[in-house]
Amino acid sequence: MNQIDLNNKIAVVTGGGQGFGYSMVERFSQSGATVVIWDKDKDLIESLNLPKNVTAVQTDVTSYESVENSVKETLSKHNKIDILVNNAGIAGPSFKTWEYPIDQWQNVVDIDLTGVFYCCKAVVPHMVKSDYGRIVNVSSIAGKEGNPNAMPYSAAKAGVIALTKSLGKELSDKNIAVNCVTPAAAKTRIFDQISQEHIDYMLSKIPRGRFLKVDELASMVSWLVSEENSYTTGAVFDLSGGRATY
């Protein structure tokens, strides 16, 4: 493992209790950061055997009040937030667009897009005050390509890409970098929400012929949240195994 220097940094990872999120939590903590997991699943975060430099706060990213409370709790313990990774997300069920249940559409968009906005809205002012921050939003190859039978997820993840570009420009005169990654699928708990037909479809589109490994995403993101990434902002970093066409 290449070592990235995150010493003395305070990092928040939403949806950090499993999958992509926990892989980043582990990588950041091994690189010297103090990490705070924001996750809605109380039972999950209580079951984790966390390193000394990792704590968890129950957070519902669809509630701005919950996000604000988590910011206050994190700042009360650590005085700052240097790194924010907006990773919390769900895939939602598989339906044709015209058959998609309205409540399920809203649920996916609330978590996958509005949750990113809420966390940025609550955290960015503190980064501006300290003139330092690194934000990475976890989008998806679906946000570029638009997966069939996954319209809300694809639309929300496309929105995350646009949000990243807008926020990156707004903060470009400060020592704050805002970028996003567009991973292909990985074998995480999110697969429990997806039909086998859709899983097979996603794999068939990846030229490398395999799904992404969670530590491969963590490796890229660990550099994006480091001080070394002092120039690139508002950018989209591909992790699709060759699937992306732009």
Regions found by a protein language model. Give the residues of each.
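Alpha-helical segment proximal to the catalytic Tyr-Lys
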Residues: 125, 169-173, 230
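Short C-terminal tail/terminal secondary-structure segment
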Residues: 2-5, 91-94, 145, 222, ...
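Canonical Rossmann dinucleotide-binding motif of NAD(H)/NADP(H)-dependent dehydrogenases/reductases
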Residues: 3-35
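The beta1-alpha1 cofactor-binding region of Rossmann-like NAD(H)/NADP(H)-dependent oxidoreductases
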Residues: 59-70, 102, 215
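Residue(s) in the substrate-gating loop at a strand-loop-helix junction
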Residues: 140
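Substrate-binding pocket helix/loop in short-chain dehydrogenase/reductase
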Residues: 95-97, 101-109, 191, 202
